Amino acid sequence: MNRLPYFYITGGDPILHPRFWDILEVLHEQSIPFTIMGNPFHLTDDVCRRLKKLGCRKYQLSIDGLRETHDAIRKPGSFDSTLAAIDLIRGAGLHCAVMTTVSGTNLHEIPEIVDLVVTHHVDIFAFGRYCPTSQAKAISERTHIEPSEYRKLLDTLWQRYERYKDSDTTFNLKDHLWTLYLYEKGLFRIPANLDANTIYDGCNCANCHITILPTGQVMACRRFESPVGALFGGGDEVTTPIYDIFNGSAENVYRKHEAMEKCSKCELLRFCRGCPAVAYGYHHSFFAPDPQCWKEV
């Protein structure tokens, strides 16, 4: 496929896996870069230095609210442990990333989280939306965000990002609705003379990522139930080379961009498409409209 591999290793807490360091040794031997998406609780100076030596580029932590909210979502003391881990990670020469999952629960706290990560010299900050696992969770007042509320949040955060553009923190515009927001502000323009059949940006499902579970099952996206094959496993499960999975019929389902109910009618189809995983959580369909997209088409 002529692709450059990059692994994101997550859990739970991947450090607790009995063969965690063996896996990293294999990646190091193959000169494959990787990121750990984990917890702060088992990080020490020695652990962070060992990660750096084995080729870890980045360690991602989660901050899902200010102290009270974050600890209620995670566990008591987690907020302070996370802040303490930032210095450990950066002190070992690793990049420290902070990821926030946005929902109705913490929507109003996100701007202050931005202030917090800048104060602590976090290298990379990004956020993504909560993917509900049931209809009840999708429409709950604790989790649901109205499209107008979400656009207002992006507007508030863009002003914060502009204020902090000379800080140590890079703000990753992870949510593809940023493209719509910047398009409306005139900061993103659709380039001329593009191939009409090429996807240039937006959701990377079936484009440049897959998820491999500990069982060997492969998902098109880690944020919703999307099985497309198995690399290994027991019993009667058929195992398939990764190339064949990525280019197989199950994966091709997620390349049918013309089937997207709302996005297919939008001029930003090849650049945005919102988050189909969030749409799946609401409607049990990858092709349903993004529930936080405010654009009328």
Segments and roles (model prediction):
Residues 1-57:
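Conserved alpha-helical substructure of the radical SAM core
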Residues 14, 41, 64, 103-104:
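Short, surface-exposed acidic/glycine-rich loop or hinge patches that mediate macromolecular interfaces
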